[in-house]
Amino acid sequence: HVHMILVPSDADGLRAALGEAHRRYTKHVNDREGWRGYLWQGRFASCPMDETHLLAAARYVELNPVRARLAQQPQAWRWSSAAAHLDGRDDALCTVAPLLERVGGAGESWAAFLSETPGDEDAFDALRLGERTGRPVGADMCRNPFTATDRHP
């Protein structure tokens, strides 16, 4: 499975971008393998989140390959954004500035951020619940104009 932190440019942006990615990848694999039909179990899961949970989500996503024992260090996982954040350089899929600005920069600052775990398990549980339900995660979301009722099915 894949974890991504995405910020859509409009209310329909996430659905449109991921739908197109699913279609293209499915076509690529089906053409290569001579298959027909769907590759994905279902629609992607998503939830809006507040600033605190954004940082917890970043830590969760970048540490996931280590937790799953796919890599010994986050930056060693080929498909992780950890190397880009540690180097402080955008790559083809990741714009690093928005998260680096929140933790004090790249390199040692990002490495220290990844090693912190204050209340992470509670935040991770909240993120998992938000992912399953599609409901907003975090205290600030009550005031956020983008709520679960604004999303398209």
Ranges and model annotations:
Residues H1:
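Basic, low-complexity intrinsically disordered segments
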Residues V7-P153:
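Short Pro-Cys-Gly-centered "Cys-loop" motif that presents a nucleophilic cysteine in a tight turn
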